[in-house]
Amino acid sequence: KGKNPQQYGIGFKEIWEIDEKKHDEGLVMHTAGWPLDNKTYGGSFVYHAENKQIFLGYVLGLDYQNPHLSPFDEFQRFKTHPSIKKILEGGKRISYGARALIEGGLQSLPKMYMPGALLVGCDAGTLNMPKIKGSHTAMKSGMIAAETIFSHIAEKRSLSIFEDKFKKSWVYKELYEARNVKPSFKWGLILGIIFTGIDQILFRGKLPFTLKHKHADHETLKPANKMPKIEYPKPDNVFTFDKTSSVYLSGTNHAENQPVHLQLKNPNLPINFTLDKYDEPAQRYCPVGVYEVQIENSIPKFVINSQNCIHCKTCDIKEPSQNITWVTPEGGGGPKYGNM
């Protein structure tokens, strides 16, 4: 109550082993924009790690408007930029993963306490978007939670003191100063960057107003016939790859014959409504091809390949009718990320 709708992004990450001559341990690269258009929020990271490895990724805001857009293919296309391609040339992709990130910031923080539980870290949404980091704020919120629980047990104090402690911490101050960055990109990449420069460099995040998130991510898609189609190049299997080979590198696995953990509230909606209005965007926003529309005897059929799911939860967030619910699968199945 009284909060803005939460905002999300889908983050992709690959680990590459590259030519030793191109490796510079500790080097950090960040980019914004390309290959996305001016109206779509996104950016990349390249981190040179140990053992000739780099961590390469792209984060794309799930408030995008074009249902023809494929976040996975935008990430693959990003790797064809000359500055990135020259790093990867002669290298080998060894791991792949994807995950939804909470990007709403201070305006979208939910109530963080309830009977018997506290919300901390990314469950609450403490990611600092301008810094592209959240592990430090997550750890601090966990420390505040520990202090709160101790007071609750030892002094019989209410868990509501958690929010009081949180608001007095440096985490709240940091999120307050970063609060206007993400919503400013609703004006487009160029204006968003200009505003962010003014807000963060000149005013240090202390402008006397707070921009709002007006729409949830599932509300932003426009009808497919109103938006331009996007033709993505076929993967070259050197720099760019398909979803099938990528899901293999995620190590995902689910026990056979278990109940499908991607549940449809209305099983007829994907074909009877979403396919016609939005060209069924689940075919594209899923980073591993869980959802397909297959034609059988000239009749379209919505297929869920739940065994491929890497638990990114993008479908639960972006589905325009909120018809898909992600629930925990049986048997501890899912991706095996290892060094990711």
Predicted features, each with a name:
Residues 302-310:
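Short secondary-structure subsegments characteristic of cysteine-rich extracellular domains
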